[in-house]
Amino acid sequence: MTEVDLYNLSPTARLLCVGFLIAAVPLLWTFYKNRGRHVSLKMRALVVLTLFLTFDLVMFGSFTRLTDSGLGCPDWPGCYGHASPLGADAHIDAAVAVMPTGPVTHNKAWIEMIHRYLEIGRAHV
């Protein structure tokens, strides 16, 4: 009998790095644009950025829901134990072979993972 891990957390570090890179661009832009300003103005800019990213995330979540992509990658973190659908290609192909019109396809997996990447990036802000 073999021992099976209850949780596969191996893609977590890669997902955190992707989220950090996504968050770094708007954060650096906001801090660069507001350099030399008072702290309260910097905080206001950070709040506006966070509100914008949250609204953007809600809109992309609606797109994810309307395209029925919520189960494109059914596990968390990652997609079938990988940080992106590229590594989960064989698992997605197997799921499509079993259920061609089912909830798992390559396009749906990418939509779901982009939604997750955006959320991780917003969480870093």
Task: Enumerate the language-model features and the residues they cover.
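Hydrophobic alpha-helical transmembrane segments of multi-pass membrane proteins
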Residues: 114-118
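Membrane-interface helix-boundary motifs at transmembrane edges
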Residues: 34-44
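Conserved small/polar residues in nucleotide/adenosyl-binding loops
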Residues: 123-125
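Hydrophobic core of alpha-helical transmembrane segments in multi-pass integral membrane proteins
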Residues: 13-32
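Short, strongly hydrophobic alpha-helical membrane anchors
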Residues: 1-11
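Cytosolic juxtamembrane amphipathic/interface segments immediately preceding
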Residues: 32-36, 107-108
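Extracytosolic (periplasmic/ER-lumenal) interhelical loops and adjacent juxtamembrane/interface segments
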Residues: 1-3, 66-113
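N-terminal signal-anchor transmembrane alpha helix
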Residues: 46-68
